Regions:
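An amphipathic, basic-hydrophobic helix/alpha-beta surface used to engage anionic
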Residues: 1-239, 281-284, 299, 303
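Short, surface-exposed amphipathic charged segments that create phosphate/polyanion-binding patches used
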Residues: 126-128, 245, 350
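Von Willebrand factor type A / integrin I
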Residues: 1, 6-7, 260-350
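Short, charged loop segments at secondary-structure junctions
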Residues: 237-270
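Residues that form generic nucleotide/phosphate-binding pockets
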Residues: 11, 153, 250-257, 327-330, ...
């Protein structure tokens, strides 16, 4: 068995290293016998597949001398994250299963699964016009976010636009030509409290929430609307998204971040209101609407903010959300648009 163990090897074949939630991937394990002596029983198992495929137990194969066996697997990615597919276990035994030996193989193979981005351009979202808040331009401050190109300095150009590093290199002044943005913005609060991950079902719903949020941010970028995301995670984040590069940064953030916030969502909202002038649009993305969140949103409405709520339509059996559907109806009655983001996702899929 020691000889058999030394002659055994495994390789991996895969379609890509980058996927999105909902993608189906093909992974093939190639088990090899590099020796000339057949190995009657080889139990091949991928550690990662064991956690991803329900009922997966590995494969028991016969490996002839100088032969290989291809073991194909299909995976449906339901959760975002970085997956390590590099660990494979090969357990060899003789014909009578008396002698056994195990060979653990590690090959560096990390697969990234990003949130799913849906095209919301053809979906009717009530209150869409409210997203487009005019940024206060009375100050006359230019927005220097998007560099379109570089050109030589012309008399009268704003010195703030001078590319000093490039100018020093060439011995003459060059300025940055900035691409204008639409002058519109939206403010999006995301409830990533740790309660979102209370069960396997909650984890899937949390994925829907993140998928919808990044899809909404992408819609804003495509329509040249600056988006400020306020994320209630353990490490609270304020992320501005107004370019494709910034959107990619948002995708990287959600690749590695799960719901782990400990501060109550309502307290998080209140602590960040100072960043948002009254009259601006605020979008709230939360799996459910409990009594506390309902009261805060009604107060925001009274303070002059324009509010939209994006929620998941499933009723949850816990005390905090016992009045969930009733709260949604109350918010609608006071003029707050409430949108079931799960229904939006399902419409896009059709």
């Amino acid at each position: 068995m020691c000889i058999a163990k030394k002659s055994l090897n495994a390789k991996l074949r895969y379609d890509s290293k980058i996927y999105n939630v909902g993608d189906i991937a093909n992974f093939t394990i190639i088990a090899e016998n590099l020796g000339i002596i057949p190995t009657p029983y080889v139990y091949v198992q991928s550690i990662m597949l064991r956690s991803l495929i329900e009922g997966y137990r590995g494969n028991l194969i016969f490996l002839g001398g100088d032969k290989c066996v291809w073991i194909k697997n299909k995976i449906l990615f339901t959760k975002r994250g970085i997956y390590d597919f590099g660990d494979i276990s090969l357990e060899a035994s003789d014909l009578f299963c008396i002698l056994k030996s195990v060979k653990n193989i590690h090959k560096e193979l990390y697969i990234k699964v990003y949130p799913k981005v849906y095209d919301l351009s053809n979906i009717s979202l009530s209150g869409r016009d409210c997203y487009e808040n005019r940024i206060n331009s009375k100050s006359g401050i230019d927005d220097f976010t998007l560099i379109k190109d570089i050109r030589k300095y012309n008399t009268g150009d704003n010195l703030k636009k001078v590319h000093w590093k490039l100018s020093a290199k060439h011995g003459e002044l060059y300025v940055k030509n900035f691409d204008s943005i639409s002058g519109k913005e939206c403010n999006l609060f995301m409830n990533m409290h740790i309660d979102n991950l209370g069960s396997d079902l909650f984890e899937i719903i949390e994925e829907d929430m993140v998928d919808f949020s990044v899809s909404l941010a992408k819609y804003m970028v495509n329509n040249r609307i600056r988006t400020k995301l306020f994320i209630n995670a353990k490490e609270q984040k304020n992320i501005e998204v107004e370019s494709k590069e910034a959107f990619l940064g948002l995708m990287e953030y959600f690749l590695k971040s799960k719901s782990d916030g400990t501060l109550e969502f309502t307290s998080f909202i209140k602590s960040n209101l100072r960043h948002i002038p009254k009259g601006n649009w605020i979008g709230i993305v939360s799996i459910a609407v409990d009594d506390s969140l309902r009261d805060v949103l009604m107060n925001l409405k009274e303070m002059g903010y324009r509010v939209n709520v994006f929620y998941h339509g499933k009723v949850f059996n816990n005390l905090k959300n016992v009045n969930f559907l009733k709260n949604v109806e109350l918010l609608k009655n006071v003029g707050i648009d409430c949108i079931n983001f799960k229904q939006v996702i399902e419409k896009v899929k059709q």
